Amino acid sequence: MLHVIKTQDDPMIKFIKDDPVRPEIPADWRVSKNREVLTLVDENKNPLAMVCVAFCDSIPSSVEELLTDAIAPNTAIFYTIWSYAGGGGKSLIGEAQQYIKDTYDHITRFVTLSPTTELAKRFHTKNGAKVFRQNSDTVNYEYE
């Protein structure tokens, strides 16, 4: 089941501390305007995987660009994802895309802001993404 975190009052926000990719991004920014944290939870509401999403009007090549506010967002940027259970990340990336398609008709693209690691490359390409752009410190993978 998908749980959407939109405010700092959500008890699930405490799991942001486990983010292994972008721990420097504060929790309050992750749930501010045009931003959400999507969590795959089990029947007991325990997190299985988490992904942070920013709705942007361009594709950022760096964290600095990610932090700018969008005027007319049309792209979902998955900028960090982590899992507490095997297969959780794969399930979450698919459910997250479907939720966004069903909820935000103005969002037409799904792109990552990923580290330049083999782990990120394997995860995203195995789950159907293609390299959109190689940047100096990041890679953008695009999902169809």
Give the role of each language-model region.
Residues 34-37:
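Short loop/turn microsegments at loop-to-beta-strand junctions
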Residues 39, 45-62, 77:
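Conserved beta-strand in the GNAT
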Residues 39-40, 50, 110-112, 133:
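A structural signal for short, well-ordered beta-strand segments and their strand-loop junctions
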Residues 65-128:
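Acyl-donor binding region in acyl/amide transferases
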